[in-house]
């Protein structure tokens, strides 16, 4: 019977914490900035590859996001070496960084719902406006 929370998930969870600390304390690249959040890590079953999902505080500008991801990808070797010192793994996984737009999409959906609710409340207050012929 397979475990619900296997080794790849446990390693990914610990790696997420360590990468967040490394980005906060060690990376000095201005393209990355101080406000980079590691929103998730997905590990391969053999623990050789890791997809790291990040978000940026200034993610309004698409060019800044692309530059941030590029900077992280260029620093992946350095991050990987620091990760190897922080975690005891036989193989330190190859890191690939991706922009996680789920936070932005969630905020967009929340704004849409708020707009619809506000419009619905206005229609309830003024029902005569809708039935004009």
UniProtKB/Swiss-Prot annotation:
GO terms for cellular component: cytosol
Alphabetized UniProt keyword annotations: Cytoplasm, Ribosome biogenesis
Signal peptide annotation: none
GO process terms (BP): maturation of SSU-rRNA
Subcellular location: Cytoplasm
InterPro entries: KH_dom-like_a/b, RbfA, RbfA_dom_sf, Ribosome-bd_factorA_CS
One GO MF term: ribosomal small subunit binding
Pfam families: RBFA
Role played: One of several proteins that assist in the late maturation steps of the functional core of the 30S ribosomal subunit. Associates with free 30S ribosomal subunits (but not with 30S subunits that are part of 70S ribosomes or polysomes). Required for efficient processing of 16S rRNA. May interact with the 5'-terminal helix region of 16S rRNA.
Family, as annotated: Belongs to the RbfA family.
NCBIfam families membership: rbfA
SUBUNIT field: Monomer. Binds 30S ribosomal subunits, but not 50S ribosomal subunits or 70S ribosomes.
Name recorded for this polypeptide: Ribosome-binding factor A
Organism: Enterobacter sp. (strain 638)
